[in-house]
Every structure is written in structure tokens, then in C-alpha cells.
């Protein structure tokens, strides 16, 4: 949601509306072949939800209560409420997470 908003111009509502399609694509084109890959890389970070929280919450707040995507946005905000935000300067500039929140030392 954060990356789509920041770099693709999608609202949280638009991204949430696409989640079923993304999952279908992953189930069709990724999951059946992942065990055949030479290498699998888990890019999750222990601090990623704490780092994404400050970026995601205002984007999720933009989802109107009257639309179908509101329930998911509300659920995600509730989930994020269990994490404490970390300061932006505590995310290393070389962190993969910078692809989502900006400020990467890499240029592409």
C-alpha cells in the first residue's frame, strides 16, 4: 500500500481492491514454481511494520467508510496499532525497506 501510493499513484482503496487479483497471480505464477528456484530470499525485517506504520496509517485513513475496502483498511490500521513507530532516521539508507518509504542510498 505504501509503495503503491508513493510510487504508482494508487490510493489505499485501489490497492486493497487489487489484493484478490495479486493473490491469484501469485498462486498461479509464483507458488507452483518457487520450490524449483535455485535460491529463495526472505526479505522480511523484524522492524518493518514499525517502520511502515507512520507511512501507512495516513494512507489508510483516506479510505472512505462507505466503500467495500474500508473493512480491510480498518483491520490493517488495527493491526498496525500494536506496533510503535520508529524514527525515519533509524531505517538504514541501504535497507530494502527504503524501496517502500524512500530515502534509499541506491539509485535506480
Outline where the language-model segments fall.
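Conserved NTP phosphate-binding and transfer environment spanning the P-loop NTPase/kinase superfamily
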Residues: 1-108
